[in-house]
C-alpha cells in the first residue's frame, strides 16, 4: 500500500443513554383476539374495560394514556402464522419474542431451517401450507386458536415486545389482502405488560386489526383516522414504500404526528427515497429507521475530526468513497447527504454505471467553488446481513496530500482491505465499526417512539438527497 494508515480498532458504541438493558416485562392477555363488526369497535372496547376493571390478585386493569400507534402491514407472515395456528398473539406487525417463537415452530414443521427469521423460502412454504389448509378446510378460527391447550409460540408468549413495553394506548394494524374485495374485517384484543405497578394498577394496550383489500381500507379511511385517539400523539409505521398517490397514505400523513418508514425495505430504493425526500418538506414529521442505523458511522466520523489539527483540515476533504451491500443504496445516499449538508456542499452532477459493482458518481461544489468527487459502490456479498444495503466501508480524502483529513471507516475485514488498498500519499486514520446488537428494527422503532418532533439533521441531509436524486432523474 502506498498510503500510511493509523489503525484504531475495534470501536464499539454502547447506547445505554438511549435504552434500558433490562429484559422486556412479562405480558398477559386481558382480552384474547375477538372478531367484531366495524360499527361495534368502540363499544366492544369499552366493554373490555368495564368487565376487566378488577383483575386477579386485586390488580386493576386500565388503558394507557400515552399514544396511538398505527401499523400498515402488507407482509402476510404474521396473519398466515395465526391462521395456521402457530401464532396466537395480536396482529400488530411487530417481530417480537412471540413472533420469533412462532416462526421457529412453523419452520420446524415445514422443514425449513429454524432460524426464527423470515425469508423468501419460508414465506413460500408458509403460503403453500396456508393454501393447502384452506383447500382442505383446516384453517383455525379465532375461537379455535384461543382454546388450543398448547400454543407453538408459547416460548415467547410471556414476554412483551419492545413496543408493548413502551405502553402505547392503542395499536391499530392495517393488513391489506390480495383476495376479492369483501369489505373490511375487524378484530380486537388487549394485553398488559406487567411492570412495576402503581397502586395495584395494570397499564394495558388495545389492539385493533383491520383486514381488507387496499381499496377496501381506503374506503374506510375516515373510520381509521377516527380510531387514532385525537387527544393523544399519533404515530404511523408505514411498513412499505411510500405511496404518495394512495389516498389512505395521504390521509394518514395529514392526521399523524409522525410517519415512520424503513428505507431498507423499499422496493425501488431510488424512486421511493425520492418520494420520501419530497415528503420531508411537509409539516408532518418523517422518520426513517434506516437513518438511525447510520448513527455509529456518523459518531465515528465526527470523532475522527475531534483533534484540532484534523478539525482545521475538514475543509480540505474533496474525495469521498462509500461501499455498501449491493441492492439498496439508501443508507449510502443518506450518509453522503449528511456529510454534504455539514460541509455545505451543493450537488451539481450525477452518473450511474451498472454492472457487478453498482457505481454512483456524484460531483459537488464546495462554498469556495472547490469540486468534490463522491463515489458510491454497491458490493455483491455472498453473506448479506438482515438489513439490505448496510454500509461496509467509507473513505474521506483530499487531493491536497498535506491535509490531515484522511479517514477510513470499515465494518469488516473485506471493507477495510478494500479501502486501505486504495493507496495514496495521505496519512489515513482507520477505525473499525463493530456491529451492534441493538440495531434491529424492533429496537430502533422502540427508541423512535420515545422521540418528539422533527430531526433537523435528518431533514437537512434529506434535502441534499433530494437534490442528488433530482439530478439522477434529470439525467
UniProtKB/Swiss-Prot annotation:
Pfam family, one: OpcA_G6PD_assem
Stored SUPFAM superfamilies: PGBD-like (SSF47090)
Organism for this UniProt entry: Synechocystis sp. (strain ATCC 27184 / PCC 6803 / Kazusa)
Chain's role: May be involved in the functional assembly of glucose 6-phosphate dehydrogenase.
Protein name in UniProt: Putative OxPP cycle protein OpcA
Amino acid at each position: 500500500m502506498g498510503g500510511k494508515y493509523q489503525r484504531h480498532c475495534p470501536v464499539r458504541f454502547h447506547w445505554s443513554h438511549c435504552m434500558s438493558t433490562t429484559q422486556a416485562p412479562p405480558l398477559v392477555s386481558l382480552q384474547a383476539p375477538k372478531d367484531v363488526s366495524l360499527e361495534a369497535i368502540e363499544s366492544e372496547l369499552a366493554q373490555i374495560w368495564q368487565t376487566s376493571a378488577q383483575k386477579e390478585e386485586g390488580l386493576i386493569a386500565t388503558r394507557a394514556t400515552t399514544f396511538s400507534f398505527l401499523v400498515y402491514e402488507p407482509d402476510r407472515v404474521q396473519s398466515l402464522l395465526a391462521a395456521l395456528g402457530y401464532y396466537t398473539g395480536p396482529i400488530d406487525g411487530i417481530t417480537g419474542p412471540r413472533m420469533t417463537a412462532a416462526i421457529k415452530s412453523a419452520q420446524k414443521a415445514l422443514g425449513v431451517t429454524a432460524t426464527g427469521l423470515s425469508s423468501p423460502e419460508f414465506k413460500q412454504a408458509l403460503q403453500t401450507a396456508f393454501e393447502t389448509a384452506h383447500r382442505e378446510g383446516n384453517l383455525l378460527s379465532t375461537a379455535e386458536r384461543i382454546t388450543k391447550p398448547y400454543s407453538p409460540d408459547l416460548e415467547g408468549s410471556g414476554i412483551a415486545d419492545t413496543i408493548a413495553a413502551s405502553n402505547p394506548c392503542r395499536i391499530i394494524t392495517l393488513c391489506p389482502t390480495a383476495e376479492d374485495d369483501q369489505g373490511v374485517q375487524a378484530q380486537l384484543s388487549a394485553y398488559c405488560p406487567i411492570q412495576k405497578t402503581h397502586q395495584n394498577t395494570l397499564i394495558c394496550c388495545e389492539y385493533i386489526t383491520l383486514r381488507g383489500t387496499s381499496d377496501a381500507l381506503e374506503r374506510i379511511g375516515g373510520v381509521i383516522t377516527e380510531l387514532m385517539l385525537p387527544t393523544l400523539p399519533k404515530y404511523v409505521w408505514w411498513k412499505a414504500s411510500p405511496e404518495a398517490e394512495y389516498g389512505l397514505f395521504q390521509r394518514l400523513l395529514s392526521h399523524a404526528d409522525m410517519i415512520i418508514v424503513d428505507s431498507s425495505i423499499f422496493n425501488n430504493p431510488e424512486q421511493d427515497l425520492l418520494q420520501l425526500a419530497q415528503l420531508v418538506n411537509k409539516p408532518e414529521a418523517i422518520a426513517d429507521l434506516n437513518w438511525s442505523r447510520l448513527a455509529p458511522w456518523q459518531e465515528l466520523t465526527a470523532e475522527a475530526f475531534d483533534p484540532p489539527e484534523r478539525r482545521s483540515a475538514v475543509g480540505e476533504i474533496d474525495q469521498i468513497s462509500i461501499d455498501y451491500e449491493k441492492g439498496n443504496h439508501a443508507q449510502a445516499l443518506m450518509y453522503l447527504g449528511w456529510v454534504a449538508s455539514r460541509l455545505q456542499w451543493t450537488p451539481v452532477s450525477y452518473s450511474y454505471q451498472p454492472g457487478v459493482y453498482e457505481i454512483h458518481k456524484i460531483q459537488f461544489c464546495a462554498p469556495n467553488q472547490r469540486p468534490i468527487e463522491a463515489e458510491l459502490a454497491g458490493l455483491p456479498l455472498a453473506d448479506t446481513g438482515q438489513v439490505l444495503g448496510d454500509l461496509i466501508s467509507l473513505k474521506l480524502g483530499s487531493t491536497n496530500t498535506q491535509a490531515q483529513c484522511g479517514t477510513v471507516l470499515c465494518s469488516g475485514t473485506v471493507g477495510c482491505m478494500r479501502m486501505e488498498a486504495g493507496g495514496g500519499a495521505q496519512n489515513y486514520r482507520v477505525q473499525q465499526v463493530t456491529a451492534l446488537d441493538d440495531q434491529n428494527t424492533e429496537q430502533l422503532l422502540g427508541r423512535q417512539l420515545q422521540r418528539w418532533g422533527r430531526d433537523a439533521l435528518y431533514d437537512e441531509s434529506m434535502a441534499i438527497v433530494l437534490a442528488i436524486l433530482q439530478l439522477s432523474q434529470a439525467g
